[in-house]
C-alpha cells in the first residue's frame, strides 16, 4: 500500500544518518536513562517529550514554561523520604493537560511511593480528559446494545443476513439491511485476522466475507454503511479491505510529516498519504455512509474522512475523537514517538504518542479536534437502550430515501 512504502523510505533516510548521532543517542535515550528520584524521572520524561513530540509547531503548550514551573516542585518531592502517588499524578496531569496529541498516554510508576500508597502507577490521557469536556460526550456503547437494535430491524424483515463475532482481536458485525451492506468493527484488525488461520481469525474472516460479497458482488446494492462508532483504530493497512474495494484510482487523503531528530522542529518533508484501489474492486453508484461518533479514534477517523472524499460518500454522526497522527515509531532511529518500557521494568515510565502528523487535503490539521460530520446526529442513550439506534436509522434513511447531505 502506498502510505506504507512512503514510511519505509522515510525510515531508510533517517537510518543513513544515525551513525553520526550515536553519542547523542546514548546521552538522551529515554528508553535506557537510569534514575532513582522523582526529579530524575521528570527530567527523562520531559526531555523525551521535548525531543520526540510531533506537534510542537502547532501545539499551544509552552513546554519550556512547564519545565520552569515543575522542576522546583519535583526537586522538592525528591528531597522527601517518600512521595504520595496522588501528588505525582496531579503534577503530570497538569503538565500534559494542554498537549493536543490525542493518542498520547503517559504511564508513570512512583519511584518513591509512600508506605500507605495502595496504587503506585497511574496513566495520564490528555485526549481522554479533553473529550470528556465536550457537551455531547458519551461512553462507548456495547456490542450487545447494537445487536438489540439490529435484532429489532430483523423483526421487521429489514435484516435478512447477518454474521457477528466477538474475539480477543476485536468484534465484527456484518449484515444486509434492506439491500444495504453494513459493517461494524470495534477496531481495525482485518490485516491480522485475514492473514491467519486460528479460530478467531476464521470467525472474523467469515463475517468480513459476508460484507464483501454484499458490497462487491451483490447484483442489487442500495448503499454501504461503514460503522466506526466506538472504533479505537488499528492497522492502517485495513484500508485495503474497507475502502480500496470501492475505488478505481488512487485516493489521496492528505499528507503526513514525521518528527525526526532531537530538536523540537526537526521534521521530515510532507509526503502524500494515498490509498491504492484493490485488485478486485467495484465503484458503487450508490451512497457510502460512514457512521462515526466521539469515540471513533485514529484509523476509524481516517476511514471516515476518506469516505467523505468519495463523490458518493458522506459522514453521519458526531465530531470524532481527534487522534489522527500515525504511529510507526522507533525512538532510537527517529528520536520521536513512543518511548520507555510498556511493562515498567526497564524504566518506570512509558510515554505513548504519535510520531507523524496528518494534514487533510484542505490543509487544516484537526489533531485534538476531530472531523465534523456532513449530517450531525447525536447519540441518544435512552432510545438506544430501547432498541432504537437513531444514528444508524439516519444513515439508512439517507440511503433509502435519497437524502444525501452536502459537505459541511
PLM region spans:
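Positively charged n-region of N-terminal signal peptides that target proteins for export
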Residues: 1-5, 22
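Flexible, low-complexity junctional segments that flank or bridge functional domains
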Residues: 21-248, 252-254, 334-339, 390, ...
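Structural recognition of the beta-strand scaffold that forms the well-ordered cores
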Residues: 181-184, 223-227, 253-255, 287-292, ...
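Solvent-exposed loop/turn segments at secondary-structure junctions
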Residues: 187-191, 230-236, 252-253, 260-262, ...
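C-terminal soluble interaction/assembly domains
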Residues: 317-337
